[in-house]
């Protein structure tokens, strides 16, 4: 798939911009704070209805406006698909083929993206919430039912936590009803995640072995607050975990076990990767990103769109060449950079957009 056209209206520092893209390589060139990353963020937001840079949607709206509008035309093997997002103070409206979508899971997945940014190193050494978000964003694109199950789980979780925080006497029977619902959706979420991690590890191990000159083996482990060793009895394991945690939950007035507490760990040759070098972290994250591309292709039969936010200058020649190998294949890529000097051996079929003060000019014109 590839993004043919993007229209931004009052998004970040863009007042109104319309831009047609190259199906292969697109480079956003400009000084810092001109809007290069904002352009990538707009593409990411159009795909996922979420920003990778802020949790506060109003930060995306131009400072002197009250709403924003994004639209794009995605080309796929099955034809073209118009996508739209309108964001106001009241919330967001999403459209596919000009038809309003009722649920997030009905919208996400029509355009798949893989983002690689400097802050992705936090995937290895950052907080567990960063890794859970990573799973949610990537898995949600290739398996829309996951977003539906996750939304339902979070809804029940919020109900349970609100009830635990209430001043009224706790009704154990009602709490058990909530627990049953939490177990139902929680097991669905965990099963989706376990399947995703297994596939990601398979693709990632091969990529990392190549990147490390056949000396490092990558493995990924899903760390759960629930016993996940026996998937056939996952529901029973979750129930037992909730029962054991009940006195703790009543005291702390929140839910201490479940997929909202889970994490993933990365290992290099059996050792915790978080203790590795900066170079190992870069290689590992690059391996994961390249694995994501292959994983998405294997499931959707479409190549995702690759977004590279000022990462080429962070990579040595070996890693750059590996990334450029991927770019030279049939995958649309967007790169931000302050200088073309950072980009070596680029494919010939590319478009360069000069970004300045929230405006984009193709080939500097």
Swiss-Prot record:
Coiled-coil features, chain-numbered ranges: none
GO BP: DNA replication; DNA synthesis involved in DNA repair; double-strand break repair; SOS response
Single annotated GO MF: ATP binding
Keywords: ATP-binding, Cytoplasm, DNA damage, DNA repair, DNA replication, DNA-binding, Nucleotide-binding, SOS response
Cellular component terms per the entry's GO annotation: cytoplasm
Annotated residues for binding of ATP: 30-37
Keyword Oxidoreductase in annotation: no
Top-level division of the source organism's lineage: Bacteria
Subcellular location, record wording: Cytoplasm
The protein's name in its UniProt record: DNA replication and repair protein RecF
Gene: recF
Free-text function comment from the UniProt entry: The RecF protein is involved in DNA metabolism; it is required for DNA replication and normal SOS inducibility. RecF binds preferentially to single-stranded, linear DNA. It also seems to bind ATP.
InterPro entries (alphabetical): DNA-binding_RecF, DNA-binding_RecF_CS, P-loop_NTPase, RecF/RecN/SMC_N, RecF_2
Main location: cytoplasm
Keyword DNA repair tagged: yes
Pfam families per the UniProt record, alphabetical: SMC_N (PF02463)
Family note: Belongs to the RecF family.
């Amino acid at each position: 798939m590839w993004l043919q056209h993007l229209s931004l209206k009052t998004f970040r520092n863009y007042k109104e911009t319309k831009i047609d893209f190259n199906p292969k390589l697109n480079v956003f060139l400009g000084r810092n704070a001109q809007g290069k990353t904002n352009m990538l963020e707009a593409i990411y937001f159009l795909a996922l209805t979420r920003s990778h840079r802020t949790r506060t949607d109003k930060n995306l709206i131009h400072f002197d406006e009250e709403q924003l509008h994004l639209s794009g035309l995605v080309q796929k093997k099955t034809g073209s698909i118009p996508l739209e997002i309108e964001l106001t103070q009241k919330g967001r409206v999403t459209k596919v083929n000009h038809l309003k979508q009722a649920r997030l899971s009905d919208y996400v997945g029509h355009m798949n993206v893989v983002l690689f940014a400097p802050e992705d190193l936090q995937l290895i050494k950052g907080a567990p919430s960063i890794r859970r978000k990573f799973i949610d964003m990537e898995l949600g694109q290739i398996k829309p039912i996951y977003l539906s199950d996750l939304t339902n789980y979070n809804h029940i979780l919020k109900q349970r936590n609100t009830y635990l925080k209430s001043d009224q006497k706790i009704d154990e029977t009602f709490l058990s009803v909530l627990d049953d619902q939490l177990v139902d959706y929680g097991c669905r979420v965990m099963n989706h995640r376990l399947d995703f991690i297994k596939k990601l590890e398979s693709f990632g191990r091969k990529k990392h072995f190549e990147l490390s000159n056949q000396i490092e083996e990558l493995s990924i482990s899903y760390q759960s607050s629930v016993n996940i060793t026996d998937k056939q009895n996952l529901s029973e394991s979750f129930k037992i975990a909730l029962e054991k945690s009940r006195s703790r939950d009543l005291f702390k007035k929140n839910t201490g076990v479940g997929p909202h507490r889970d994490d993933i760990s990365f290992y290099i040759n059996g050792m915790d990767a978080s203790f590795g070098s900066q170079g190992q972290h870069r290689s590992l994250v690059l391996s994961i990103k390249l694995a994501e591309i292959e994983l998405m292709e294997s499931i959707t039969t479409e190549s995702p769109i690759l977004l590279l936010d000022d990462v080429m200058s962070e990579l040595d020649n070996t890693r750059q060449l590996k990334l450029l190998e991927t770019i030279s294949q049939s995958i649309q890529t967007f790169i931000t950079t302050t200088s073309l000097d950072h980009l070596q051996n680029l494919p010939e079929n590319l478009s360069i957009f000069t970004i300045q003060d929230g405006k984009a000019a193709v080939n500097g014109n």
